[in-house]
């Protein structure tokens, strides 16, 4: 086989595993993240991802004399949340369907903070979702005065938009999975990997299965036999890449 290079992204789960990745020093034509799920999974499309944090400033007054004075940040936050589409959430979407997720929230009468993540595979829909998230704040401010401030930033983009331009890395991985005696399952990631960022650094980086399931929950597990097949797949990739 040819030269093999390995990198570790210790901050992947907080979305920063590739922030300081030295793509120039890594110097490969393509790469793979070992961050997939079930046996045979091969993914080269990810979400476009953004996060918006709303900060709501309320007015606290003794409840006995609060009429016409109190601005309850708890209630304003609840109203803001109600403006998002009820069915466009993770528990009601699949495949290429995007969503909004209220990731965490802290609130009391005087102030509230809400963190939403925004996801969509389609770039235009992603832009529309971000615009909608900003419009939500504008609607609340129009009703209650300027009580909402927000910070919106992009986290990563759909690596498929890069990889589709040259799918050799996908073709090699697909054949390698077959050579390992496994049936490839090519599906979009309903999430992101370090490859979502690395692909935009000039190294197309699809994602390969590792045998895990039920990620980010109390029922998460990995299958040792499937992990072994993932290792076999990497060996097969090394063989094919030399050709």
Protein language model regions, located:
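Metal-dependent peptidase/peptidase-like ectodomains
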Residues: 23-75, 122-178
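Active-site-adjacent substrate-binding region
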Residues: 75-92, 99-101, 147-148, 157-206
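General structural feature for long, well-ordered alpha-helical segments within catalytic domains
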Residues: 2-3, 17, 27-28, 73-76, ...
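Acidic/histidine-rich catalytic neighborhood of metal-dependent amide-processing enzymes
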Residues: 1-47, 89, 93, 97-103, ...
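His/Asp/Glu-rich mid-to-C-terminal helical/loop segments that flank catalytic regions of hydrolases
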Residues: 71-89, 124-125, 130-136, 171, ...
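Structural motif
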Residues: 4-5, 29-32, 52-53, 184-185, ...
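Alpha-helical metal-binding/catalytic segments enriched in His/Glu/Asp
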Residues: 1-13, 52-56, 62, 67-87, ...
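Short beta-strand elements
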Residues: 51-58, 103-107, 118, 207-210
């Amino acid at each position: 086989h040819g030269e093999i290079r390995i990198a570790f992204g210790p901050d992947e789960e907080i979305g920063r595993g590739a922030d300081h990745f030295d793509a120039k020093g890594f110097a490969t034509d393509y790469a793979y993240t070992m961050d997939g799920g079930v046996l045979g999974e091969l993914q080269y499309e990810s979400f476009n991802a953004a996060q918006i944090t709303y900060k709501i400033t309320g007015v606290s007054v003794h409840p006995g004399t609060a009429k016409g004075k109190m601005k309850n940040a708890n209630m304003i936050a609840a109203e803001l949340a109600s403006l998002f589409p009820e069915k466009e959430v993770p528990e009601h979407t699949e495949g290429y369907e995007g969503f909004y997720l209220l990731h965490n929230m802290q609130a009391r009468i005087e102030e509230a903070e809400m963190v939403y993540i925004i996801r969509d595979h389609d770039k235009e829909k992603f832009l529309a979702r971000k615009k909608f998230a900003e419009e939500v704040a504008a609607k609340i401010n129009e009703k209650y005065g300027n009580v909402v401030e927000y910070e919106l930033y992009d986290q990563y983009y759909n690596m498929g938009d890069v990889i589709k331009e040259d799918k050799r890395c996908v073709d090699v991985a697909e054949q390698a999975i077959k050579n390992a005696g496994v049936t490839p399952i090519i599906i979009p990631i309903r999430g992101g990997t370090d490859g979502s960022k690395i692909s935009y650094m000039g190294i197309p980086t699809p994602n390969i299965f590792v045998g895990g399931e039920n990620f980010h929950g109390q029922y998460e597990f990995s299958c040792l036999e499937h992990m072994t097949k993932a290792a076999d797949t990497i060996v097969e990739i090394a063989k094919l890449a030399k050709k």
